[in-house]
């Protein structure tokens, strides 16, 4: 049986090797990103690595500070490298993100980065079934019921995300999340454009043409893929010694 936690850790540790002193680094949100933050923190303590980090959520910021990583709230300079997880990866490197509720900040940080690397376990690359993971859409609370109905005009099975108390999940930006159960996404570029044309939609959890590399953790190590115009191309297979 696959050890998905080990796979996440292997992907995160390998991607962390690309972080160098002097960089401004975007840090993602989610379980795989937390392995990354712990590994960067280890390098800060043991190797004297010096970076500044832009964090995509309060949870990420808290963990980064606990690991001794310098956190900045923003920068006018371009971020050198962002490393983040993904809920699903499609054939041409399109991502579904936002399962952790941080998609708006994640997209702002990724868009303003020279490069974005994605760290995932072996379940996340779904070229043939892209869209089987629910697509998160961040919406403003005002008139949110109407916004949901407008989203249902595109996908009838669209639900408002709730927290453990049965109340609407609230993002760090004070917004709500709608989860769209698309089943299959054939044209992510036009889908994103259509969704963002709906008033009340803040951001969509589709990342088109942003990621440059994918680190797919395995039980033995990590597969590294580059994203090209023709699709995902395997660069390297790394085995954990």
UniProtKB/Swiss-Prot annotation:
Q: What Gene Ontology molecular function terms does this protein carry?
A: ribose-5-phosphate isomerase activity
Does the keyword section mention Isomerase? yes
Question: Is Isomerase included in the keywords of this UniProt record?
Answer: yes
Pathway this chain belongs to: Carbohydrate degradation; pentose phosphate pathway; D-ribose 5-phosphate from D-ribulose 5-phosphate (non-oxidative stage): step 1/1
Q: Which residues form a coiled coil?
A: none
Quaternary structure, from the entry = Homodimer.
* Source organism: Thermoplasma acidophilum (strain ATCC 25905 / DSM 1728 / JCM 9062 / NBRC 15155 / AMRC-C165)
Q: What does this protein do?
A: Catalyzes the reversible conversion of ribose-5-phosphate to ribulose 5-phosphate.
Entry-linked PANTHER family: RIBOSE-5-PHOSPHATE ISOMERASE (PTHR11934:SF0)
One Gene Ontology cellular component term attached to this UniProt record is:
cytosol
Instruction: List the protein's name.
Output: Ribose-5-phosphate isomerase A
